[in-house]
Amino acid sequence: MAYTEALTRKDDLMNERIKAGEVFKLVDLVPYAEGKVVKMDVAHNDKMKCILMAFDEGTGLPEHAAPGEALLFDLDGEAVISYEGKDHPIKAGENFHFAKAALHAVKATKKFKMALLLILE
């Protein structure tokens, strides 16, 4: 995970599937679905979002601009990150940094699960 402790405020939201005081694996929280990309919000507030995504092989996200600085954590499988016109293969255990407004796309070359920590301004 990108952080070990998060300060909470009344308007913060932690996904109710994640129970305080219990051990869990991020990779197990979001399922694969045939031919689809599955998304689950883990936590968010007005300054950050933590999102999990599971991509079936061959699926992906079209090119778009990052709304803020972001860190991608490859939890399972393999993908290609197209970033500012250059392809970057990524596999489980590796990470990738996106600058705010950078154009990028994601394409799963095998089944692929990722966590994304997005810093909002």
Identify the residue ranges that each predicted region occupies:
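Short acidic-glycine-tyrosine-enriched beta hairpin
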Residues: 85-100
